[in-house]
């Protein structure tokens, strides 16, 4: 699909669900990716993969994670899964390679530095697929919260705390902030769709 690789402005959006936030102890249990163009139009959704872990690993999670992942259905999907970290990484890289060259896209999402740390340890090939830069929507959210609270309060996530719903929320959230970015918002901020 060489024609699909032409756009260097394409963006890879990613989200991980983990057993917790400790990058030395916890583990990735779900991954999802979406590729957009520079105007945040979705070009393709990658595989949404629950990663196999034993019941003991899930039971060792803190209460918030146990409750959240049971409620979202991820708990059972992880127990039913036969996908390993290596398989999830390979499937995700294979998908991305159809849409964008390695090293062309920053890692995009919310609190993406945390995801990058987990990827570095558990899916290093995938982590290296991204440019070293990050497009972290959380940064814009934190600035808006401080400088323009009404803008920050104007967006409500609909997420079910699954990887794919969180990726979609991140894209929607950046679309929301883009309309308030003045000259940085480009044609979209001026009401012109690209």
Swiss-Prot record:
The active site is at 132. Its EC number is 3.1.15.-. SUPFAM superfamilies: Ribonuclease H-like (SSF53098). It is an enzyme of class 3 (hydrolase). One of its GO terms (cellular component) is cytoplasm. Pfam families: RNase_T. Keywords: Cytoplasm, Exonuclease, Hydrolase, Nuclease. One of its GO terms (biological process) is DNA metabolic process. Residues 11-174 form the Exonuclease domain. It is found in: Cytoplasm. GO terms for molecular function: 3'-5'-RNA exonuclease activity; nucleic acid binding. Belongs to the oligoribonuclease family. 3'-to-5' exoribonuclease specific for small oligoribonucleotides. NCBIfam families: PRK05359.1. This is Oligoribonuclease.
């Amino acid at each position: 699909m060489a024609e699909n690789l032409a756009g260097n402005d394409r963006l890879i959006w990613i989200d991980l669900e983990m057993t917790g936030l400790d990058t030395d102890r916890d583990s990735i249990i779900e991954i999802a990716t979406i590729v957009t163009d520079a105007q945040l139009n979705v070009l393709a959704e990658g595989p949404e993969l629950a990663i196999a872990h034993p019941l003991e690993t899930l039971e060792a999670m803190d209460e918030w994670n146990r409750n959240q992942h049971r409620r979202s259905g991820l708990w059972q999907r992880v127990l039913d899964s036969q996908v390993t970290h290596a398989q999830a990484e390979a499937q995700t890289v294979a998908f991305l390679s159809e849409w964008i060259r390695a090293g062309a896209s920053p890692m995009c999402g919310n609190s993406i530095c945390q995801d990058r740390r987990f990827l570095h340890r558990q899916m290093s090939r995938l982590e290296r697929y991204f440019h070293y830069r990050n497009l972290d929507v959380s940064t814009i959210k934190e600035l808006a919260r401080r400088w323009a609270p009404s803008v920050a309060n104007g967006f409500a996530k609909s997420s079910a705390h699954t990887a794919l719903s969180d990726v979609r929320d991140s894209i929607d959230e950046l679309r929301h902030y883009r309309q308030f970015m003045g000259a940085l918002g480009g044609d979209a901020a001026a009401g012109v769709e690209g």
